[in-house]
């Protein structure tokens, strides 16, 4: 695709199934407290592949490390250890020019669209800015054509009604559409979407997710979808990775993870979600998580979930932490007692 274009041909089914555009291996990020007394393990050995044209959901409670993982992929912060390979390029080996190109190919949709926009800019300036930074379009007329095309993709038409407005003049849903358009305008390979619908009203969330899913299919994009809401991950993602205290504890297709969860933490997340059934709202089952999430500077021995798990035994504390185990079809989990529960 040439630089001014904003559409990408959808990949073949074989490419979507087999080709990894993002490979994360043993990724780690430690933060040191201001006094240097504590080392916070925000991301603690995360590994996964993202296939071409795939949506991977990273799901977990606040503090599980999912947003930090997204920032590491975006190179907004540097990893303490591990590797991130995008389309065959190891990000640790990128020079200045390669890093600049990388930031065009890997884009982020932020949780708060208003905070990510200059309030003094008009919408046309918000969308033109990335084109100027990356030298796309030799004239403003060319760039405005790309701006209008991006706005058409996110259903903000006619564009003339919005171009001269400022961000505060738009609704939350409209701002998120503009944030999505700004990401798409650079024709990225991968989009990291960090809680993209959590700050807009419930009635608009499904609409925005439908829009993003349609655009993803049309352009053949790969998404890392970060969310605390496993119900939106079920709708939006092809695969789901459940994170707890810096590690992935279960990963697989969304059907397997949601319909046949193995790890007790995954089960608790799912069972806490209310879904409409037979005209009323019911809780699926009753399985509560006890206590608070431990500090990432003092991770429990053995299984890190054991302090909140209803099924934990002494061996969960004394034996080494369980590694991810494949139980078939790429469905992996990290629970030693999964057959018993």
Predicted regions and their residues:
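Short catalytic/signature loops enriched in Gly
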Residues: 4, 13-20, 34, 160-161, ...
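ABC transporter nucleotide-binding domains
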Residues: 1-260, 339-341
């Amino acid at each position: 695709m040439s630089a001014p274009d904003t559409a990408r041909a959808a990949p073949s089914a074989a490419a979507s199934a087999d080709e990894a555009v993002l490979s994360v291996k043993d990724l780690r990020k430690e933060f040191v407290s201001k006094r240097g007394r504590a080392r916070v393990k925000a991301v603690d050995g995360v590994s996964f592949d993202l296939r071409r044209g795939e949506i991977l959901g990273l799901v977990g409670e606040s503090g599980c490390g999912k947003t930090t993982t997204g920032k590491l992929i975006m190179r907004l912060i540097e990893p303490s250890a591990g590797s991130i390979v995008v389309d065959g390029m190891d990000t640790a080996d990128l020079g200045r020019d390669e890093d600049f190109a990388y930031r065009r190919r890997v884009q982020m949709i932020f949780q708060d669209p208003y905070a990510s926009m200059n309030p003094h800019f008009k919408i046309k300036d918000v969308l033109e800015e990335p084109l100027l930074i990356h030298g796309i379009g030799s004239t403003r007329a060319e760039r405005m054509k790309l701006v209008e095309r991006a706005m058409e993709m996110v259903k903000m038409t006619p564009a003339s009604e919005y171009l001269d407005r400022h961000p505060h003049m738009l609704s939350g849903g409209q701002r998120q559409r503009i944030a999505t358009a700004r990401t798409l305008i650079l024709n990225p390979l991968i989009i990291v979407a960090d809680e993209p619908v959590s700050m807009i009203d419930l009635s608009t969330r499904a609409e925005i997710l439908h829009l993003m899913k349609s655009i993803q299919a049309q352009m053949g994009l790969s998404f890392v979808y970060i969310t605390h809401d496993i119900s939106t991950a079920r709708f939006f993602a092809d695969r789901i990775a459940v994170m707890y205290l810096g590690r992935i504890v279960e990963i697989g297709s969304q059907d397997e993870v949601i319909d046949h969860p193995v790890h007790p933490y995954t089960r608790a997340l799912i069972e806490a979600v209310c879904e409409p059934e037979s005209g009323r709202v019911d809780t699926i089952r009753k399985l509560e998580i006890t206590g608070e999430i431990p500090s990432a500077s003092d991770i429990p021995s053995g299984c890190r979930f054991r302090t909140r798990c209803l099924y934990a035994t002494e061996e969960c504390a004394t034996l080494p932490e369980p590694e991810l185990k494949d139980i078939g079809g790429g469905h992996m989990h990290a629970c030693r007692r999964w057959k018993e529960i």
